[in-house]
């Protein structure tokens, strides 16, 4: 899996963890057309999406009321479609929690 230059620090670390484990998730996968929602990482054969949430230590887009509502709509739609979404903060990725949980989910 190549690592695009526009990744956040958490996404970059998660991509490297995936490489180390021999995993090749798809990146920036659009789902639920005509919506333009994207998953940061997606394992299509397992219907498993991974989202690395940025801006959790500040009042970022995902924590503002409209951003939170849009995220809820996105994740609810994914659930209705049978897609499991695992969400992680950058700190969780750096500690190794994210890759551990993804490996467990892929068993």
What are the residue ranges of the model-derived segments?
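Nucleic-acid endo/exonuclease domains
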Residues: 1-107
């Amino acid at each position: 899996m190549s690592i695009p230059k526009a990744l956040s620090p958490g996404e970059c670390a998660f991509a490297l963890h995936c490489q180390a484990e021999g995993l090749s998730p798809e990146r920036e996968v659009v789902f639920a057309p005509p919506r333009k929602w994207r998953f940061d990482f997606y394992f299509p054969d397992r219907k498993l999406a991974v989202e690395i949430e940025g801006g959790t230590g500040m009042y970022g887009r995902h924590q503002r009321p409209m951003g939170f509502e849009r995220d809820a709509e996105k994740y609810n739609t994914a659930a209705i479609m049978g897609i499991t979404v695992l969400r992680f903060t950058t700190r969780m990725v750096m500690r190794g929690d994210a890759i551990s949980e993804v490996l467990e989910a892929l068993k």
